[in-house]
Amino acid sequence: MFEYLKGTVADILIDKIIVEVNGIGYRIHSTIHSVSQIKKGDAITVYTHLVVREDELSLYGFMSIEELDMFQKLISVSKIGPKVASGILSAYTPNKLSAYILSKDISALSKAPGVGKKTAERIILELKDKVDKTNVVYDYTLFNDDHKDDDEAVQALMALGYSKLESEKAVEAVRDMSLGTEDVIKRALKWLMK
């Protein structure tokens, strides 16, 4: 129904943005990746997907068509709803997610919020033929478990009172492989406080 919205960012929350279009504020559920790319007051185009439920209409929006496309593929998987799909895309970029699906990396997929081993297997089974293999750029650093600094940063944020989900989202949003644990924590705290 809505392909995209062009408007001004009125407010930003961890996983939602409010976009004002011609005097109407649209609450759009989004991912950490999309939310981290914008600031309050920015003029943006958000690519959207309308979810119709018995008791509500929800808009999910993304800053890139690739992220929207992957979201739509994820919600086509049985037992994956829009919230879980959005959580998965908060944990992984579409390219990284495609690489995990094509390499059948159940372990990596099951680290996303709301995804266990069975769900990861289902994602691989149902999407392995739907993922565009030509656009996937393999980053072989993804396939080693060398994210010790991230895990330490998440643990530190949790010790400061943030939930595991908030901590993981913040660390993912500020991730830079060249940063040490201390710098990741500092950036994540700034991100959580904005």
Swiss-Prot record:
Region Domain III, residue ranges: 151-194
Keyword Metal-binding: no
Keyword line: Cytoplasm, DNA damage, DNA recombination, DNA repair, DNA-binding
Entry's Gene Ontology BP terms: DNA recombination; DNA repair
Principal subcellular localization: cytoplasm
Places the protein is found: Cytoplasm
One term under GO cellular component: cytoplasm
Database matches in Gene3D superfamilies: 5' to 3' exonuclease, C-terminal subdomain, DNA helicase RuvA subunit, C-terminal domain, Nucleic acid-binding proteins
Family: Belongs to the RuvA family.
Comment block on domains: Has three domains with a flexible linker between the domains II and III and assumes an 'L' shape. Domain III is highly mobile and contacts RuvB.
Function: The RuvA-RuvB-RuvC complex processes Holliday junction (HJ) DNA during genetic recombination and DNA repair, while the RuvA-RuvB complex plays an important role in the rescue of blocked DNA replication forks via replication fork reversal (RFR). RuvA specifically binds to HJ cruciform DNA, conferring on it an open structure. The RuvB hexamer acts as an ATP-dependent pump, pulling dsDNA into and through the RuvAB complex. HJ branch migration allows RuvC to scan DNA until it finds its consensus sequence, where it cleaves and resolves the cruciform DNA.
Subunit structure, interactors included: Homotetramer. Forms an RuvA(8)-RuvB(12)-Holliday junction (HJ) complex. HJ DNA is sandwiched between 2 RuvA tetramers; dsDNA enters through RuvA and exits via RuvB. An RuvB hexamer assembles on each DNA strand where it exits the tetramer. Each RuvB hexamer is contacted by two RuvA subunits (via domain III) on 2 adjacent RuvB subunits; this complex drives branch migration. In the full resolvosome a probable DNA-RuvA(4)-RuvB(12)-RuvC(2) complex forms which resolves the HJ.
Protein's recorded name: Holliday junction branch migration complex subunit RuvA
Source organism of this protein record: Alkaliphilus oremlandii (strain OhILAs) (Clostridium oremlandii (strain OhILAs))
Gene expressing this chain: ruvA
